[in-house]
């Protein structure tokens, strides 16, 4: 166990949620099952009208390390995450979507990998598409230049609360891609993002569940994030971003355009996506 783990820092697990009580309970249970015991769970209920409020009241009675905040009106994912962070008391913050699951050693392993000079730590993810699962193996170290091609981190990291506060938290003006935007700002100010060499999260990729961020906002958010950061990008990064924007918009991008737009280090990934996904 590292010196950092011997100091036993408190980790705040932040979970925004909206109308997914059954999935939320599963997500919370995966945090309660962590090998790292010094955890608080901060849930922000974004004005759910299902059984979420009752579920949270029951769980808070059963587990003293759970706290919840309820938005009177739906305010979206970014606002809900910021509220959770503001109400957290841990030195470290780790996010979890309400339909995803942490593996039991996630927090312990991420803490063990965190060190000065890095903005955050992520892990490999198991992507659950329902009928099939794919393990997303990420680069051991993800730099700002890597991120300016696309979001190579995914949807969650473990980082210090003070780092998130220093860069201003999640951008509430973005309708989506708020996580991607935050990773860019963290990497810009605090260094690259490290990947723990383990698969520590199961990400629900099913498209039939109501989300706190609607699919209607996905394209708008991606474009807004690109516009916000394109001044940092070189020509190759901009070209690849335009290619991914077309994919996000549902355009049928041919092989020739793919080879013209995709840098060599990303070609295998794009060929695999085009053939099998």
Q: How would you name each of these model-derived features?
A:
Residues 93:
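Short aromatic/hydrophobic "clamp" motif used to bind/position activated sugar donors
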Residues 30, 37, 45-54, 73, ...:
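A conserved acidic beta->alpha catalytic loop
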Residues 22-25, 50-59, 101, 105:
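Acidic helix N-cap motif at the loop->helix transition within catalytic regions
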Residues 105-135:
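Conserved donor NDP-sugar-binding/catalytic core segment of glycosyltransferases
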Residues 1-32:
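N-proximal low-complexity "stem/linker" segments adjacent to membrane-targeting elements
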Residues 140-225:
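Conserved nucleotide-sugar donor-binding catalytic segment
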Residues 2-6, 181, 188, 199-277:
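C-terminal subregions of glycosyltransferases and related glycan-biosynthesis enzymes
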Residues 71-88:
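Glycine-rich, basic loop-to-helix element that forms the pyrophosphate-binding segment
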């Amino acid at each position: 166990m590292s010196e950092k783990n011997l100091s036993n820092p408190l980790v705040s697990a932040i979970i925004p949620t909206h109308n997914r009580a059954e999935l939320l309970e599963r997500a919370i249970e995966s945090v309660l099952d962590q090998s790292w015991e010094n955890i608080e769970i901060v849930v922000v209920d974004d004005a759910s009208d299902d059984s979420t409020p009752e579920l949270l009241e029951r769980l808070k009675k059963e587990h003293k390390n759970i706290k919840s905040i309820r938005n009177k009106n739906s305010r979206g994912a970014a606002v809900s995450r910021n509220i959770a962070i503001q109400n957290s008391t841990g030195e470290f913050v780790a996010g979890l979507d309400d339909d995803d699951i942490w593996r039991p050693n996630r927090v312990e392993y991420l803490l063990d990998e965190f060190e000065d000079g890095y903005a955050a730590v992520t892990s490999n993810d198991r992507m659950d598409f329902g009928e099939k699962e794919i393990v997303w193996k990420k680069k051991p170290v993800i730099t700002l230049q890597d991120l300016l091609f696309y979001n190579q981190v995914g949807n969650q990291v473990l980082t210090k609360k003070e780092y998130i506060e220093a860069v201003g938290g999640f951008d509430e003006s973005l309708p989506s891609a708020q996580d991607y935007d935050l990773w860019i700002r963290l990497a810009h100010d605090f260094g690259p993002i490290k990947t723990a060499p383990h698969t520590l999260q199961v990400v629900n990729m099913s498209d039939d569940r109501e989300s706190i961020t609607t699919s209607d906002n996905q394209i708008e958010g991606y474009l807004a994030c690109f516009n916000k950061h394109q001044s940092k990008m070189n020509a190759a990064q901009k070209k690849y971003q335009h290619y991914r924007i077309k994919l996000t918009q549902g355009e049928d991008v041919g092989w020739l355009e793919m080879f013209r737009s995709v840098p060599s280090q990303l070609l295998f990934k794009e060929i695999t996506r085009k053939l099998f996904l």
